Amino acid sequence: MPKVRTKDLIEQFQLELISGEEGIHRPIDTSDLSRPGIEMAGFFTYYPADRVQLLGKTELTFFDTLTSDQKQERMKALCTEETPCIIVTRNQDVPDELLQASRESGMPLLRSSQTTTRLSSRLTNYLEGKLAPTTAVHGVLVDIYGVGVLITGQSGVGKSETALELVKRGHRLVADDSVEIRQEDEDMLVGSSPDLIEHLLEIRGLGIINVMTLFGAGAVRNYKRITLVINLEIWDQKKNYDRLGLDEEKMKIIDTELTKITLPVRPGRNLAVIIEVAAMNFRLKRMGVNAAQQFSERLMSAIELGNQE
């Protein structure tokens, strides 16, 4: 099912529908836009018919210089069955040839009061957000000191309970149980909650609680960029866990690699505090302060001095 249709653009940007009402359910599959200037000159070899077409002052001024036959020919070629729509900007008058071609092909012809550049920028941002690659991950997403932390792990390991403790400590819940993730840009993942379970947290033995109702609007967020993954797992005595912090794991979601930290879970460990510190330490590393690396360098210096003596 298409994520975006022409009617969505009409509603989102308050566009005026001139003709082609029967085509407003046409799908839009790309965020790229087209300003068919070279096509106005008659070159349709590489015409991107599947894109939203924008006709600004430049295109329509050139169009006025064409002969009557050329005008009809160019507009018929522009209005194809796969073209989502043509938008005339700046509230300019719609050429009769374009109106006729739109009616014959059933392609939506729209008009906007905005400038071409302004509308193009807004359309691109909207379409990139809607058409971005998406996936869903089982886990909890929390905003901790401005760091979007995705907490993962097997069912029953204590993800929701840890999230509840983090919320009580002043951090903000984004999503529990199912995190919808979309890649809005290269190396940029944004997580949010499905509408059905937004602001809800499930605690075994307690049931479902509404975090916003209990703790206020400051305890929740609608979406957050994900920069750190913390995986909770039951403590395995046979497994060697990182004790210095020099080894950095990675986890790939869609096309983006994120820093991953594995935290072993056992009675007596305050996971909320550990995750808080992990988020703060992650911020420090991004600022160029790496405590583990500094310790390693001091240790190597001490060893070298000891060998010299």
Swiss-Prot record:
CDD domains: HprK_C (cd01918)
Entry cofactors: Mg(2+)
Catalytic activity line of the entry: [HPr protein]-L-serine + ATP = [HPr protein]-O-phospho-L-serine + ADP + H(+); [HPr protein]-O-phospho-L-serine + phosphate + H(+) = [HPr protein]-L-serine + diphosphate
Enzyme's top EC category: transferase
Annotated segments matching region Important for the catalytic mechanism of dephosphorylation: 264-269
GO biological process, one term: regulation of carbohydrate metabolic process
Residues at the active site: 138, 159, 177, 243
InterPro entries: HPr(Ser)_kin/Pase, Hpr_kin/Pase_C, Hpr_kin/Pase_Hpr_N, P-loop_NTPase, Ser_kin/Pase_Hpr-like_N_sf
This enzyme's EC code(s): 2.7.11.-, 2.7.4.-
Keywords associated with the record: ATP-binding, Carbohydrate metabolism, Kinase, Magnesium, Metal-binding, Multifunctional enzyme, Nucleotide-binding, Serine/threonine-protein kinase, Transferase
Residues that, per the record, bind Mg(2+): 160, 202
A GO MF term: magnesium ion binding
A Pfam family assignment: Hpr_kinase_C
Sequence positions that bind ATP: 153-160
Region of interest: Important for the catalytic mechanism of both phosphorylation and dephosphorylation: 201-210
Notes on the domains: The Walker A ATP-binding motif also binds Pi and PPi.
Extra facts: Both phosphorylation and phosphorolysis are carried out by the same active site and suggest a common mechanism for both reactions.
Complex and partners: Homohexamer.
Family according to the record: Belongs to the HPrK/P family.
NCBIfam families tied to this protein: hpr-ser (TIGR00679)
Known role: Catalyzes the ATP- as well as the pyrophosphate-dependent phosphorylation of a specific serine residue in HPr, a phosphocarrier protein of the phosphoenolpyruvate-dependent sugar phosphotransferase system (PTS). HprK/P also catalyzes the pyrophosphate-producing, inorganic phosphate-dependent dephosphorylation (phosphorolysis) of seryl-phosphorylated HPr (P-Ser-HPr).
Protein name: HPr kinase/phosphorylase
Gene this protein is translated from: hprK
